[in-house]
Design a protein with these regions (language model features):
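Hydrophobic/aromatic-rich alpha-helical bundle segments in the mid-to-C-terminal region
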Residues: 122-131, 143-198
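Hydrophobic alpha-helical connector segments
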Residues: 61, 75-107, 155
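Amphipathic alpha-helical segments used for helix-helix packing
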Residues: 88-91, 102-123, 127
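Hydrophobic/aromatic residues within well-ordered alpha-helical segments
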Residues: 62, 66, 70, 85, ...
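Short hydrophobic clusters on alpha-helical segments that form packing/core surfaces
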Residues: 16-24, 96, 159
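Generic hydrophobic, amphipathic alpha-helix propensity
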Residues: 12-21, 37, 62-66, 70
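Helix-turn-helix
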Residues: 15, 22-57
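N-terminal intrinsically disordered/low-complexity leader segments
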Residues: 1-11, 193-198
Length: 198
């Protein structure tokens, strides 16, 4: 069965968004140019406006896609760890602060990759960024069902900040040590037997 023009256009649109979702995590918002994204997607720069009204519209969609991809990857990791019988919180901490996150900038959490850039963006991109942050906090709260929203916010901030600093140190012993220390501290604080979370 042949694809319709609308199907081809949608597939092309999805390819552009996928490329941009990786690019914003790899280069930050400022490092994402329309021409580069289109070239990496195997398209000409001129075709961009058949899919998006503006670069800002692309960034919003790319951030949403990056968040969905990261969320799906974390969910898969949680399911694998849950099969081992660990708590949801332990699974989340182990997945988010796993050593493999040091080298997976373009496929990892967009909040950790872009938090420093978020305040300097347009209103639309900042709004999409705020949605990602709220979803991260909600995910932490779901893993710690007895925790307050404030506690979930602190834990989310610890996860993001630790990952950012560990990446700044690099995919080396120092970066891995920082992740390990944060995992241990978070699990001791919130996942130890008899721990009361507020």
């Amino acid at each position: 069965m042949s694809r319709t023009p609308d199907t081809r256009k949608q597939e092309t649109h999805e390819r552009i968004v996928d490329v941009a979702a990786r690019a914003i995590r790899r280069h930050g918002y400022a490092g994402v140019g329309v021409a580069d994204v289109m070239k990496e997607a195997g398209l000409t720069h001129g075709g961009f406006y058949a899919h998006f009204d503006s670069r800002e519209a692309l960034l919003v969609e790319a951030l949403e896609r990056a968040g969905r991809q990261s969320g799906e990857a974390i969910t898969r990791a949680l399911e694998r760890r849950a099969a081992r019988g660990v708590s949801a919180f332990r699974a989340l901490v182990e997945a988010y602060l796993g050593d493999e996150q040091l080298a997976s900038l373009e496929t990892g959490c967009p909040v950790a990759a872009l938090a420093g850039d978020m305040p300097r963006q347009s209103d639309a991109v900042r709004a999409a960024s705020a949605v990602r942050v709220r979803r991260l906090v909600a995910g932490v709260q779901a893993a710690l069902p007895h925790a307050s929203r404030a506690t979930a916010s602190v834990v989310a901030g610890t996860l993001v900040g630790t990952l950012q600093l560990a990446r700044a140190l690099g995919a080396n012993a120092d970066g891995r040590a920082m992740l390990s220390a944060a995992r241990k501290a978070l699990l001791q604080q919130y996942d130890a037997p008899g721990t009361a979370v507020r």
